[in-house]
């Protein structure tokens, strides 16, 4: 059981160091499931009055017992080469999230561009769908989002670090 206490300064490197300590102690295998204990926080994760369109922004990550790297992740959105095609998203492999793009690429200088907006729809288990449109551009658009399920995120990071250390 991995108990998380809501420490907002916890980083992936801290989890890696913890796993290295297990490895040094001779742990090679964990019998059963790795459980993430977030019971220290048993209340609502959103306050009354929070603007709904801020909930996916990094500064608005839900309060959680399991926080790793501020429960924030970054992606790059690339416009398609051809107007009308779907833009694509690159997510670093070390982020245990899934992103889907429904973003339509507009021609550079398109009159629609002034009305073009992006929106993100969070789903279960840290799955996100990016919608809207993006004018063609030569450089990717950097974006950052708040993790919505801290326990799932922390658990996936812990499992990845255990696997990397050879602990099965």
Feature annotation, model-predicted:
Residues 1-168:
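Conserved serine DD-peptidase/penicillin-binding transpeptidase domain
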């Amino acid at each position: 059981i991995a108990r998380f206490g809501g420490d907002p300064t916890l980083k992936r490197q801290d989890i890696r160091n913890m796993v290295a300590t297990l490895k040094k102690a001779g742990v090679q295998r964990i019998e059963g499931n790795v459980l993430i204990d977030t019971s220290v926080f048993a209340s609502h994760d959103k306050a009354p009055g929070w603007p709904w369109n801020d909930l996916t922004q990094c500064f608005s990550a839900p309060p959680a017992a399991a926080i790793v790297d501020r429960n924030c992740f970054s992606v790059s959105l690339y416009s398609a080469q051809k107007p009308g095609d779907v833009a694509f998203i690159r997510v670093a492999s070390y982020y245990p999230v899934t992103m889907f793009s429904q973003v339509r690429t507009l021609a550079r200088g398109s009159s629609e561009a002034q009305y073009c907006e992006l929106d993100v729809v969070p789903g279960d288990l840290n799955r996100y769908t990016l919608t809207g449109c993006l004018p063609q551009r030569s450089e990717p658009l950097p974006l950052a989002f708040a993790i919505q399920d801290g326990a799932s995120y922390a658990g996936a990071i812990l499992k990845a670090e255990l696997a990397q250390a050879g602990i099965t």
